[in-house]
Amino acid sequence: MKHSYIAKRFQSSGAGLSLDTEALAKYKDIIDLSIGDTDFTTDESIINAAFRDARAGHTHYGDPKGDPELIDAVCRAWEEDFGQRLPRDHVLVSASSCLGMALVMLAILDPGDEVIVFSPYFPMYREQIELAGGVCVDVPTYANEDYAIDEARLRAAITPRT
């Protein structure tokens, strides 16, 4: 195609996150654990609480740093769990873990920096790292090893760019 509306960096990518749904359709009872989309419906009490919150007027953009009550709760939980005070200005609540991870990668990676990711991993990790100019270094873990991190494989993956 002479003129494409897709950025060049995405034109040569493979299938990405797309699934071969035709191939998967022949299997029964598959639970997709790749992106955190559960195979059950959200509990009614949570749905009702969300409705109550919306009816109370919480339908507008919130503080870009996160809901102040949630930030306070995170700070309290951190102190209870780890015995350390966590300053409020060290907490940023994002709209999703994907957004949060992407922001972290964009903030800390320089082009060519390497990030070690233990596989299997959440599909978006590689894309977030590469979008920020980093290089994803895959260090495998295996079921027959209880997905434990192997120190030798980890050490072999570390370079001056890590």
Task: Report each predicted region and the residues it spans.
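Generic N-terminal amphipathic, Lys/Arg-enriched alpha-helix
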Residues: 1-9
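A generic, residue-level signal for flexible/boundary positions that often mark functional hotspots
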Residues: 4, 34, 55, 78-80, ...
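Alpha-helical structural elements
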Residues: 5, 56, 73, 116-120, ...
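N-terminal small-domain helix-loop-helix segment of the aminotransferase-like
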Residues: 8-96, 103, 153
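Short conserved AdoMet
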Residues: 25-28, 55, 109-110, 159-162
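Residue-level detector of flexible, active-site-proximal loop/helix-junction positions
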Residues: 37, 68, 98, 122, ...
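PLP-dependent aminotransferase-like
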Residues: 89, 106-161
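Short, hydrophobic alpha-helical packing/hinge segments within bilobed ligand-binding/sensory domains
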Residues: 100-101, 125
